[in-house]
Amino acid sequence: MVAVIVAAHGHLAEGLVASSAMIAGPQDDVVAVTFDPSEGPDDLLAKYAAAVEASPSDQYLILADLFGGSPYNAAARFAAARDDADVVTGVNLPMLVEVLGRRMLGGNLAELVEVASTAGANGVKVKFVDRKSVV
């Protein structure tokens, strides 16, 4: 099974993991990695190592919040040193829920990367409201 690590600035990752459990049910091997203002890249690398230790798996998917942000940069360094990890940025709730659903069906790392990319983008919708009809 692919372990999923959700990494974000502040405590967003914890909120995403908790919210996904409301929708998809509690999941094994889903870890939130937080990043506080007092922390640096080495702290994040240590947190990724701890997440892997806490959720031993064949493969790891790290879903980071922002391309170029510290959680992503550290995740990219972490994954580059391994053969069993990939990183996708722009994590949102639709992305996480879809990834967990596909994982429950036995999806491998490559499949989950594709699902994450597609679901993350498709989860963003714009609903135009006819403001003239709104009172």
Predicted regions and their residues:
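Short, acidic/small-residue loops that bind anionic groups at enzyme active sites
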Residues: 81-99, 112
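Glycine-rich phosphate-binding loop signature in dinucleotide/nucleotide-binding domains
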Residues: 54-58, 82
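N-terminal intrinsically disordered, cationic/polar leader segments
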Residues: 2-31, 35-47, 73
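Short, glycine-/small-residue-rich phosphate/pyrophosphate-handling segment
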Residues: 102-129
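Acidic beta-strand-to-loop metal/phosphate-binding motif
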Residues: 59-65
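Short Gly/Thr/Asp-enriched flexible loops that form oxyanion-binding sites at enzyme active sites
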Residues: 71-81
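Conserved small/polar residues in nucleotide/adenosyl-binding loops
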Residues: 133-135
